[in-house]
Structure formats: structure tokens, C-alpha cells
């Protein structure tokens, strides 16, 4: 599982600036659950080969009793509970504030590793910046400038050393005797627990828990029709006797972790509710992570033809970017449609792990170009010469040629569709990379 780093501090100390620098993006996944008055932002960062999730919390007022500040404090506490490391940010220009002391008092009691970070320290001597903050009793302050990047790399490297040291051994997760790793994700109350119980109970398979992180990640191994599968961190489901039930707290962090760890993701939607921005955000993270995907539309039973047509149209319109994934209309409660859903899981996994021979890829590329050439950009027309596979899960196709920076997104999409059709790559994202020759004359004509 990717470790989680939570950014905590009072308002306006630079948490969002640091978040944007760590994730190298201004785009963030947002938890827009009903009733939340201030969203937490989630993103992914990476240092070398070490990925991590980072949470940008709202301004923290631990003693707030009601209203928006109370709600923001509640959400921050949840983020701290889910974090492997907490980065506590204070303002070096404005100095120590009473709220900083209240936050420090709370954080000391959590038992989480705390990194005290003094932001906005550019142009200031370390001793002048840090002295006041020793009073918080959280060890040596680390001076940074989130806006300029000063000190950020060293700080995050130290934080990741601690975060990864606390991660469980992954030998169990990577055991080759295990089957396809599946994450079932979706909003609260879409029927995840019902689907899990339908899957593990249908063949009278004994399911068992395998402890993961200290925050109760679950691994459930089961067989179906002679095939092995593993449900990984069922994200909001906990064992109650012989069945799984939804718990009261929906965790976006656990959802993102389970997506990252999966081979195939089942995105479960509720046919009786409109597709929300949150559904689209979760789906977008699946694609960003390159995970194979199957869509399950639950609670389908009882719909008349008109309602079904409307639900299908809503799915096509709002999740158009998932057109590579198969959709299944199911009833987890009545166990209808689940067989076809699982067959698509198998197909999506097979597609994600496909081996694409260079001669066949190049032949498919040439046929695609002969059928429709890329457009010129000024005097230059891109020349696509040959292709080979650059990776699996998701499949990566590397195309070599000349002037390939002139290839449009529309033409790239055309090539993707041609490759999907030729190699039956349904259910998996597909990456296409272009590598141009340095010959400035080879692309003329």
C-alpha cells in the first residue's frame, strides 16, 4: 500500500502550496461526500521509485465546537488517523500562534510521526525562523519555502523514510499463488458489501482476513469457478461474523490505496442515483493509475425499460472517458449479472497483461496509417515507422518515427482504437508513447 502523508496546520500557512508542489499539479481528487462543508484534497506524489498519497486538509482549529471550523477539524482528524506521517506546517513569517500550540497538543496524543515544518522561510536565517517553534515540543523544526521549493525535497525524503519503514511487508500481497487482485470501489451505499458477500458466498468459499496496515486493510482470498481471486482492502467494509458490512466512515484514502494495489477495479454505481462528480473523480484515478476496469451498475432490478434507457444514457454521457471498459447492469442483492461481471474481470486482466509482438504491432500501425494518414502541421507530416511494446498493466505501445510531436490528440485516439480492435484490448487503459528521430529531413514529403 502507498503510504499516506497528511498536511496539517492552521489556515493560510501554505498547505495547498506545498500540496501542489508535492503532487506537481494543481489538479486534485476531491472528496465531495454529502454533508462535507470543506473538501479534503488527495493527490499522488513520487520520489524516485517511492510513490505516496498526500492529503491537503482544511485549516485546523482543534477546539472548534460547531459550524464550519468544527467540520473542518473533524475531517482533519480523520486524515491524521489515516496517515502514516503528519507534516505539521507553521508560518515562519508570522511566528508562533496560539492555534499552533493547540494543534501540537492534539498531534502529540495521536502517536503518529510528526514532521514540524516552518514554511515561508525564504530569505530568513534558520535560527531566526526556528527558535520560537521549539516551544511546541515536536523536535527540530525544518525550514522550507513551499512557494520556491527550498528544503522541500529533503523534508519529503525524510518523511518517506519514516512512512515506508512503517509499511507492512509486501510478500503476502505479491504472493504468486494468489489470484487476480480486485478492488471494489464506489460511493457509500451503492452495494459494495452486498456484492462482496455475493462473490465470496456463492460457491461456499471460506473467506479469511489477512492483516495489512495498522488501519485494518483487508485481503480476502476466494475461488470462483476454479479461479483464484483476492479482494484487496475492501475500502469501507469490515467483517461482522461471516459477512461484510459497510462501516459508517467512507475513506477516500483507502479507496485510492486499494485502486493502486489492484490488478482490476470494479467501479460500482447505483442505478437509482445520478452519476456524481465523485464517481467521475474515482474513475479518473483508476485511469490515471492505469488499472484495468469493469463498471457495475447495481440495483438494476425493478427498473422499467424507460428508466433503464435513461440510466444507460447517463452512464455513456458522464463517463465517456471510460468507453474502453465493459459495463454490467446487476443486482448484487439478487445475485443477477454477477457471472458476466466476473467474466469481464478476467477479460480485463488478460487484456492488461497482453504481450504484443513487435511485428504484429508494426503491421497494425502501418495498416492504420494506410487507412488514415496523420494531418500535416505546416509543411511537416508525421511519419510513423514502427511500434513495439513498452510495458504491461497497462499496455504501453511505443511508436517510432519522425516529427511525431505533430501528431494530434485526435489521431492518437484513432490509433488507440485501432490497436484496441486489433488486439482485443477491452477493459484496460492503453498508453501510446511517441519517439521521434533526430533527422530533420526524414519527415518531409
UniProtKB/Swiss-Prot annotation:
Location of the EngA-type G domain: 3-167, 180-353
Signal peptide: none
One of the GO BP terms on file: ribosome biogenesis
Record's keyword terms, sorted: GTP-binding, Nucleotide-binding, Repeat, Ribosome biogenesis
SMART domains, sorted: AAA
Residue ranges annotated for the KH-like domain, each copy included: 354-438
Chain positions recorded as GTP 1 binding sites: 9-16, 56-60, 119-122
Keyword Repeat among UniProt keywords: yes
UniProt xrefs under InterPro entries: AAA+_ATPase (IPR003593), G_ENGA (IPR031166), GTP-bd (IPR006073), GTPase_Der (IPR016484), KH_dom-like (IPR032859), KH_dom-like_a/b (IPR015946), P-loop_NTPase (IPR027417), Small_GTP-bd (IPR005225)
GO molecular function: ATP hydrolysis activity; GTP binding; ribosome binding
Domain of life: Bacteria
Pfam families found in the cross-reference section: KH_dom-like, MMR_HSR1
Residues that hold GTP 2 according to the record: 186-193, 233-237, 298-301
Function of the molecule: GTPase that plays an essential role in the late steps of ribosome biogenesis.
Family to which the UniProt record says this protein belongs: Belongs to the TRAFAC class TrmE-Era-EngA-EngB-Septin-like GTPase superfamily. EngA (Der) GTPase family.
Subunit text: Associates with the 50S ribosomal subunit.
Listed name of the protein: GTPase Der
Organism: Burkholderia cenocepacia (strain ATCC BAA-245 / DSM 16553 / LMG 16656 / NCTC 13227 / J2315 / CF5610)
Protein encoded by which gene: der
